[in-house]
Amino acid sequence: AGETYTLEETLVPDNSGYVPANAIQFTVEDNGKVQHVIMQDDYTKVQISKTDIATGKEISGAKLKITDADGKTIAEWVTDGTPHYMERIPMGTYTLTETVAPIEQGYVRAESVTFEVGPTENIQRVEMKDDFTKVEIFKADMTDGHELPGAKLKITDASGNTIAEWETNGQPHRIERLKPGDYTLTETAAPAGYLLSEEVHFTVQETGEIQKVTMYDAPAHSLILTKRDIATNAKLADARLTIRDAYGTTIDRWTTTDGD
């Protein structure tokens, strides 16, 4: 019988992305023939996921990059809704950075993620989670601040496009994943016993914190206004009237139907 030996890999090629192979035992037979011993190196495999913090689903449209410990960029890409797979990354410490969030979908940039690529041929997984914008709309009584049901509201963007419409139910109305930017909250119909409110302009910031917007309604008082012809005293229809307070704030506006 021949002698038995062990072949070990003590050092892999620098910056190659290969991982040390398992030791191999082999026996040299005393038969005069050439014997071949093959040691195969596997390599590192890294899977990067960009997911929604709430649903865990993969997100498309995020611009990501990976830098090494020296700050050198080794990879950049735009997510496509599937995990990003990389091979042969040298072992070491890396940082995953989101340079641009998919704000069109209402997401905000995530904090950078530091990760290690270790000496293994198994897939090493790294996940970066994106938070999203959250806006709470409050419709409140001007006198005591309690929430009002029965108001019809809508939100429009800077281009005048309607983003959302709803009727209040006495609870704050929450909207998620609004694109950061400028918006207008409009009351199209006031609750019974209240006057129509002025529009509220607000800006959605790029943050995962809850952003609050409040629109107040003033209670209506018992007041009958009539629009008449100065000569005939006849009631006039189709007159557009506005009531403003001492500060110039619009309290109510309407078009007369039969003079009232």
Kindly label every feature range from the protein language model.
Residues A1-D260:
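Solvent-exposed loop/turn and edge beta-strand elements of beta-rich ligand-binding domains
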